């Protein structure tokens, strides 16, 4: 473990909470101190759930550590059953309680409760949230699901969606409609929306559709081996992937690969004349491996973007992530340190970032357009409207979401033509995002510079130049602390002629070049010398 300001994943017990919260008739008894109850807010505040998660905490305190914490846990289990009357109970420890080493599974079994008890042993100091969700769902399936006779009509299970998942609610609806249009029934959706009774009848389906490998692949592999159910490998995000998914499902179900794409508009929108400004946009992707790999395909093959960087935070999927990146001629960035991600983005200077909530913060700091494609996300990415990522409607949503942060084609030309205009200057941002308020009393930078009291500058002969004859840039250079690099006015003006999406990189390279050469003032000549140096 490490101390950090921000993390992509919580501890494993948060993943277990996502599974329990998504289900009905399930209750999770968590051996944890009072401080770990913060996790409730993830669901009530961020996901806007109307009720708190079905989780009971032992909430032990420091004074309890010298007494019997095992009895405290058993009391919590007994009270949870009597109060909530669940169909099944999950038991486990938080990262803090793991240090006490109480056997939560054995303690719960000793109570002989009249419902199944699912034991969770989640290594809090080696694994994280997605593993916790994946492992919890696997243990639930092992405890409750059994082989059984198949349904008369061809059917499947949808595996992987959980509470707090990125657009899982809407993806379930979209994929269900897609399958029903092919004549395939959905036997159960799990864990989200499923009860323990639904888990028990998973074996009735003919095959499984794995929507989210991060949280459902272990259960899908177990079902393939134990229940003799094959599962899909294609995640239907994007037009191409959805068509591949339809073909894969049709082969498993023995039906015709036909799907209703009458609502699909993304291909024409991407190819139409008012969308050509998308072509060649440089994009950086980061998030969970499943969404990043799928989004990279959409970005390159369906939007016409150039993928310049991609990576994921979940190390369990490092191998497929690296294999996918090779297909784009890239080396995948696999890290859970947001500072490394920010460093990579600064070095690549993309025109668009597709990432998580953290990349949205990074993009805001760097002034780069951004769209969210993956958990973890904040409250605004749990919309009231129908907004799937999967299927044909999901492809439409991807197009709208990704192009919205970008500057429109005609407006980009206006920015090039009227760089100094009060309305169309680079810092104003795309007009459809709303203007940036500037206080009426705040003077422009050049006016402020001219308003400063002028100071004299020494000549080479030891005399002085009258203050009014000193150019503002020279005055700034004279007043700058020793060793600080100053841009002259003509160089700043020339820098603004460089497209805004690579201007930051050009500025950094020029300042680095000047520092290496021992220069403290950057002129137009320095700017072009630096350009020639880095172009070699």
UniProtKB/Swiss-Prot annotation:
Any Gene Ontology biological process: photosynthesis, dark reaction
Pathway this chain belongs to: Porphyrin-containing compound metabolism; bacteriochlorophyll biosynthesis (light-independent)
Its EC number(s): 1.3.7.7
Region of interest (Disordered), residue spans: 426-448
Domain of life: Bacteria
Cofactor: [4Fe-4S] cluster
Active site location: 274 (proton donor)
Free-text comment on the cofactor: Binds 1 [4Fe-4S] cluster per heterodimer. The cluster is bound at the heterodimer interface by residues from both subunits.
Annotated coiled-coil segments of the chain: none
Keywords in alphabetical order: 4Fe-4S, ATP-binding, Bacteriochlorophyll biosynthesis, Chlorophyll biosynthesis, Iron, Iron-sulfur, Metal-binding, Nucleotide-binding, Oxidoreductase, Photosynthesis
Gene Ontology MF term list: 4 iron, 4 sulfur cluster binding; ATP binding; metal ion binding; oxidoreductase activity, acting on iron-sulfur proteins as donors; oxidoreductase activity, acting on the CH-CH group of donors, iron-sulfur protein as acceptor
Residues noted as binding substrate in the record, renumbered to the chain: 409-410
Reactions it catalyzes: chlorophyllide a + oxidized 2[4Fe-4S]-[ferredoxin] + 2 ADP + 2 phosphate = protochlorophyllide a + reduced 2[4Fe-4S]-[ferredoxin] + 2 ATP + 2 H2O
Quaternary structure and partners: Protochlorophyllide reductase is composed of three subunits; BchL, BchN and BchB. Forms a heterotetramer of two BchB and two BchN subunits.
Record's function text: Component of the dark-operative protochlorophyllide reductase (DPOR) that uses Mg-ATP and reduced ferredoxin to reduce ring D of protochlorophyllide (Pchlide) to form chlorophyllide a (Chlide). This reaction is light-independent. The NB-protein (BchN-BchB) is the catalytic component of the complex.
Family according to the record: Belongs to the ChlB/BchB/BchZ family.
PANTHER family recorded: LIGHT-INDEPENDENT PROTOCHLOROPHYLLIDE REDUCTASE SUBUNIT B
Record-given protein name: Light-independent protochlorophyllide reductase subunit B
Organism: Cereibacter sphaeroides (strain KD131 / KCTC 12085)
Gene: bchB
């Amino acid at each position: 473990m490490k101390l950090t300001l921000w993390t992509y994943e919580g501890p494993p017990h948060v993943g277990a909470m996502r599974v329990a919260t998504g289900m009905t008739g399930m209750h999770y008894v968590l051996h944890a101190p009072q401080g770990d109850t913060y996790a409730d807010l993830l669901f009530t505040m961020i996901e806007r759930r109307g009720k708190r998660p079905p989780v009971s905490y032992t909430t032990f305190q420091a004074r309890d550590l010298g007494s019997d914490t095992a009895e405290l846990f058993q009391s919590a289990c007994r009270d949870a059953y009597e109060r909530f009357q669940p169909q099944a109970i999950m038991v486990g420890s938080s990262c803090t309680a793991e240090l006490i080493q109480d056997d939560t599974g054995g303690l719960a079994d000793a109570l002989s409760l009249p419902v199944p008890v699912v034991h969770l042993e989640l290594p809090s100091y080696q694994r994280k949230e997605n593993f916790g969700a994946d492992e919890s769902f696997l243990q639930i399936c092992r405890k409750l699901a059994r082989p059984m006779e198949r349904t008369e009509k061809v059917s499947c299970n949808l595996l992987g969606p959980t509470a707090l998942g990125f657009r899982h609610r809407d993806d379930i609806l979209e994929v269900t409609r897609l399958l029903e249009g092919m004549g395939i029934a959905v036997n159960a959706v799990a864990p989200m929306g499923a009860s323990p009774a639904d888990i028990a009848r998973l074996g009735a389906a003919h095959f499984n559709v794995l929507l989210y490998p991060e949280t459902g692949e272990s259960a899908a592999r177990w079902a393939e081996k134990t229940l003799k159910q094959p599962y899909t490998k294609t995640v239907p995000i994007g037009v191409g992937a959805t068509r591949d998914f339809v073909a894969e499902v049709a082969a498993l179900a023995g039906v015709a690969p036909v799907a209703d794409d009458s609502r699909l508009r993304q291909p024409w929108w991407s190819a139409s004349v008012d969308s050509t400004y998308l072509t060649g946009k440089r994009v950086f992707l980061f998030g969970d491996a499943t969404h990043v790999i799928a989004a990279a395909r959409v970005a390159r093959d369906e939007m016409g973007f150039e993928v310049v960087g991609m990576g994921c935070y979940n190390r369990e999927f490092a191998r497929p992530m690296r294999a996918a990146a090779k297909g784009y001629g890239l080396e995948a960035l696999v890290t859970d340190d947001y500072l490394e991600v920010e460093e990579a983005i600064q070095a690549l200077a993309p025109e668009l970032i597709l990432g998580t909530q953290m990349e949205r913060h990074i993009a805001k700091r760097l002034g780069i357009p951004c769209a969210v494609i993956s958990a973890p996300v904040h409250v605004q990415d749990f919309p009231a409207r129908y907004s799937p990522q999967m299927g044909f409607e999901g492809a439409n949503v991807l197009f709208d979401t990704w192009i919205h942060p970008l500057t429109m084609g005609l407006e980009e030309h206006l920015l090039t033509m009227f760089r100094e205009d009060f309305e169309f200057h680079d810092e104003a941002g795309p007009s459809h995002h709303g203007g940036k308020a500037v206080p009426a009393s705040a003077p422009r930078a050049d006016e402020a510079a001219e308003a400063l009291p002028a100071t004299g500058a020494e000549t080479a002969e030891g005399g002085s130049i009258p203050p009014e004859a000193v150019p503002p840039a020279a005055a700034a250079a004279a007043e700058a602390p020793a060793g600080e690099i100053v841009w002259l006015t003509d160089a700043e003006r020339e820098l603004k002629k460089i497209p805004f999406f690579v201007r930051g990189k050009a500025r950094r390279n020029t300042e680095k070049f000047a520092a290496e050469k021992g220069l403290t003032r950057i002129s137009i000549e320095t700017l072009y010398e630096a350009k020639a140096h880095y172009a070699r």
